[in-house]
Amino acid sequence: DAFQAKVLGAVSAAQHVHLLAEHYGICAVLHTDHANRKLVPWIDALVDHSEEYYKENGKALYSSHMLDLSEEDIDDNLNECARMLERMAKLDMSLEIELGITGGEEDGVGHDIEEGADSSHLYTQPEDVLKAYDLLTPIGHFSVAASFGNVHGVYKPGNVQLRPEILKNSQELVSKTHGTAEKPLNLVFHGGSGSEKDKIAAAISYGVFKMNIDTDTQFAFAEGVGKYVEEHMTAFKYQIDPETGAPLKKYYDPRKWLRQGELSFIKRLDEAFEDLGSAGRSLAK
C-alpha cells in the first residue's frame, strides 16, 4: 500500500547511505523534514525500524526527524514532540520541532505569503521557545526551527522581512531563566533559499547550526539540466540527427543530463558551505 511504500522507501534510502558512508569512511547525517500531524504515523514507523537497526548496529537509521505541528496549539504541539522524543532519545536520535509558522510551500505543504498581509504568525515567540526548552531538555536532544520571517521558496522582495534578532531574544530568555551558557539552543533556519548573506551570518551568530536551501538546490539542479538540454536540443527531439544521420543516444542518455544537474547542484552546495562556515570541515574529523 501507499503508506508502506513511503516507509520502505525511506528505510531503503537510509540503508543505502549507511552502506556508502561506511565504504568511504565519511560521516553522514540523515534527517526527515516537515512531518505534520498526518505524517506522525510515518515517523513512528521509521522509529520502529530504527529500533531494530539500533539493536544490530548500535546506531539508528536516521540521525533525526522533524515534527512540524506549528499550526496546532502550542501545548498539543509540544506534548506530541515530547512523546516522540521519548522514543528517539533511547536511540541517540535528535528531534527537530517548529515553533511559529515558516511561510511559503515545502513539498506541497505550506502557508500563503501575500503582499500586505499580517505576518505576525511568521515570528516565533521567545516564551514558546522557553516552554519547549523546559519540557524537552530533560528528555533528550532537540533543535528548534524558529520562525523569524523566513519563508520556504523564493518570493518578491519586501513581502516578508527577516528578523534574526528573534533568535537572539530566544537564546537570551532561556539563558537568563536557567543560568545556562550564552547560546543554549540549537536553532534551524528554514527557508534559507534566496536569503541575504548578512542575514545568514546573523542567524549563525545567534545559534543556527543548520540551514535549509531546498528551493535553491532544486533550481540549481534544474538549471544544470536545462542548459544541457538547450545545448543538445536536437537529441531531445530525435533519436537520429535528421541532417547527418548520426545517432544521438549519447546525448539524450539520462545519465548524461542528470549528471549535469548533479554538477550544478554541487556548485550550489559549495556556495552554501562557504556561507555557513563549514567548508573543509567534517564531523568525522
Language-model features: locations:
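Alpha/beta enzyme core
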Residues: D1-F3, V7-G25, N36-K183, K197-A202, ...
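Structural detector of well-ordered beta-strand residues that form the stable sheet scaffold
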Residues: V29-D33, L95-E96, V188
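Residues that form generic nucleotide/phosphate-binding pockets
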Residues: L135, G224, Y228, D275
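Conserved acidic functional residues
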Residues: D33-A35, D68, H190-G192
